[in-house]
Amino acid sequence: MNDSFFQRDDVGSEPWWQAVACRGTPLIEPTTAGRYRLTFLWRDPAGASSGIQRVWLNITGVTDHHQPGLPQSLARVPGTDVWTWETELAGRWRGSYCLIPVGEPAPFEGEAKVDPQGIRLWWRSVFPLAQADRLNPRRSWQGGRGLAVSGVHLPDAPAQAAWTAFDEGLDGREAGASDLRQYRWDSARLGNSRPIWVLTTGNTTPEERPLAILLDGQFWAQAMPISGPLQRLTERGLLPEAIYLLIDNSDRALRGSELPCNPDFWLAVQEELLPQVRAWAPHALTAASTVVAGQSFGGLAALYAALHWPERFGCALSQSGSFWWPQRGTPGRLFEALEAGKGTGQPLRLFIEAGLREPAILEASRALVERLREQGHALDYREIDGGHDALWWRGGLLDGLVRLWQPLVAPDR
């Protein structure tokens, strides 16, 4: 290990671990210009000898199941309770990770040929053993697969100041938490029921407030509560007073059928849900101020809604959109819609992001953005050094809302 902590002669001692805890993990040190070495650590609770044989490191976009190579395990420093692994990344990287200690080697170790599908299945089998990094000073959270994960923000990563209170564990005292109300949507068209949340960030002119629909709303309401950051940006004048509708999509089977290019879902939203929401929380009906925002399948759904109902949804915020759907390696359904003329005649305001470490999504996003620009839409596109990861989505979601609603806050800017 190259980190200066491993040059000490008391590695693994209680004072050494106390020093590690004060600094926080992973240990981060600059190497060459714009790059940093990250050293991940895990302390074996059984001491220098135990039944733990591997501590797998699942870093989104670096060592996770989407990567072509073999999974990576920390290695024990001989004669100590210290397990460690290091890598080097560009300074703009941001990502989440978890540690998975297990009592046996993986079945694929020693095999000459790697079976990607077999490795994916193996990952799923060990996910229940995942744990967040107890030495990471920032608050952990439940990721999309229900895993406890921790986050890393390298020094040059885009700023996320609005999330500082969450990272420091202060979200329970954040402004805006009391303005989030939960309801239940019973859909006759879809034949199902789910929770939804409505957040209000101000009441000065209720009928003029814009509306934002956030897909995967249960994540933004509970796992990564967005109410405080939104309220904070509103109070700073960066966002207008608004209504936010957070729609639950946590059922994986329903999510896979409702979000990818499903007209019934969006007709149900327009015919059943939005009239109820307007009764609970009055807001403007103008398409130009209505945003649909989502990630992954939700990112696909957001752009699908805007292209097919531009008279209702004039803005789309799409992050890591699954534009390859329904089959990887072929032009997706949205490309077919654009070929058929969708998106022409009514310019949209679009904010699209993709991660540099999610190759299929990145390739499809670049191709789709080119087509959308040819149609003349007002479009902001960003590529982020990260994987398929809510840790950077949360910052881009706020940035996108600020950008899309900028005419409402500073019409002359």
Description of each model-found segment:
Residues H283-S296, A316:
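Alpha/beta-hydrolase fold nucleophile elbow
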Residues W324-L391:
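The feature captures the conserved acid-bearing segment of alpha/beta-hydrolase catalytic domains
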Residues G299-P310:
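Short glycine-enriched nucleophile-adjacent loop
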Residues M1-L41, P155:
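Non-catalytic, glycine-rich low-complexity segments
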Residues T31-R92, V102-E168, A188:
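Aromatic-rich carbohydrate-binding modules that target alpha-glucans
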Residues W197-T200, E207-Q218:
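Short beta-strand element of the alpha/beta-hydrolase
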Residues G217, N249, L317-Q327, L356-E358:
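Active-site nucleophile loop of the alpha/beta-hydrolase fold
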